[in-house]
């Protein structure tokens, strides 16, 4: 994509800031690179994201692993060159992290992005993704309940606005809030991730009534919202498809939850035109990526120093020093 002069200059200065941050021992420089770029070129996010073929992955849990799976699956495709794919699978998933990743590969025509829940609507509106993977909404803190409902509404509105130009959504059929948001998409591929999200799914996101749960899934008897029939589902260590195909996952990443993540990634890769067997070859090479807890502990240690360094760096630019 052709970048504006302002953005090219901002990216160059962002790279200098990242190098200076590393030399000063303030972290990897990824965060400050994106922050400096956005500070100097406020339109960097839409300008960098819009010209590409985007696949985005979001959810409270599992998005880093699923992004790794999907990236490996697409890398294994015979139709896409490795240098033509950029990803932020290190977990830097807010605006600055996405800008930082995309700015390092401005010529790559394909992007596979891990996206924080708060950034999804912007990605849909400004990036026009080809595929959007919606994993789950987990109310891991009581005060997040209202926030998640608001975000679900925001996703739904963005998908409604996108209409037929919007993404194919690969969505977790077992999560009522995900289903309610994803129903607004012009095309949805439903994945039953098995265990049911009953602990997080008491009230209907559409009408507020109490949801009923049984062996067939969940449903609301007041408004009719219910768990949709799955196009893909997990059975033991296999990904099952509605058309009768079965795929042995044989992934290296431990944990039953990651079988669901792998199935979502496989469904998304298939929607992107990747042969499922090629996708699986790539996915089986994925080892356990850095989990969110590890990244959080590192971020806590460097965030304050990084922000202070950013302020000093921008101040020096403004003053000409």
Residue ranges: model-predicted function:
Residues 102, 269-272, 313:
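Generic structural signal for hydrophobic core residues of well-folded globular domains
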Residues 27, 52-55, 248, 296, ...:
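Exposed boundary/loop context
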Residues 291-298, 302-309, 316-319:
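Low-acidity, Ser/Thr- and Arg-rich intrinsically disordered low-complexity segments
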Residues 88, 252, 301:
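Thr-Gly-centered strand-to-loop micro-motif
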Residues 187-294:
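Adenine nucleotide phosphate-binding catalytic loops in nucleotide-utilizing enzymes
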Residues 1-3:
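N-terminal Lys/Arg-rich, disordered targeting/topogenic segments
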Residues 5-190, 197-199, 203, 320:
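Phosphate-binding loop of NTP-binding sites
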């Amino acid at each position: 994509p052709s970048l504006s002069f302002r953005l090219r200059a901002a990216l160059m200065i962002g790279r200098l800031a990242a190098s200076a941050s590393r030399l000063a021992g303030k972290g990897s420089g990824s965060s400050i690179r994106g922050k400096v770029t956005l500070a100097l070129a406020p339109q960097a996010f839409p300008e960098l994201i819009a010209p590409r073929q985007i696949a985005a992955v979001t959810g409270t849990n599992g998005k880093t692993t699923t992004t790794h799976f999907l990236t490996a699956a697409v890398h294994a495709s015979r139709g896409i060159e490795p240098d033509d794919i950029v990803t932020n699978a290190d977990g830097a998933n807010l605006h600055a992290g996405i800008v930082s990743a995309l700015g390092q590969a401005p010529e790559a025509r394909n992007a596979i992005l891990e996206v924080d829940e708060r950034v999804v609507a912007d990605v849909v509106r400004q990036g026009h993704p080809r595929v959007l993977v919606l994993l789950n909404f987990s109310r891991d803190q009581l005060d997040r309940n209202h926030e998640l409902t608001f975000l679900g509404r925001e996703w739904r509105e963005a998908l409604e606005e996108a209409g037929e130009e919007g993404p194919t959504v690969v969505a977790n059929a077992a999560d009522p809030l995900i289903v309610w948001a994803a129903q607004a998409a012009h095309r949805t591929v439903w994945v039953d991730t098995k265990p049911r999200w009953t602990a997080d799914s008491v009230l209907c996101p559409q009408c507020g009534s109490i949801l009923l749960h049984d062996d067939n899934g969940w449903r609301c008897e007041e408004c009719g919202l219910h768990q949709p029939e799955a196009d893909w589902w997990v059975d033991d260590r296999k990904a099952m498809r509605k058309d009768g195909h079965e795929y042995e996952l044989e992934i290296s990443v431990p944990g039953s939850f990651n079988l669901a993540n792998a199935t979502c990634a496989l469904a998304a890769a298939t929607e992107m035109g990747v042969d499922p067997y090629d996708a699986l070859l790539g996915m089986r090479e994925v080892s356990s990526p850095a989990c969110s807890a590890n990244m959080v502990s590192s971020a806590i240690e460097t965030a304050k120093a990084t922000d202070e360094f950013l302020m000093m760096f921008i101040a020096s630019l403004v003053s000409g020093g």
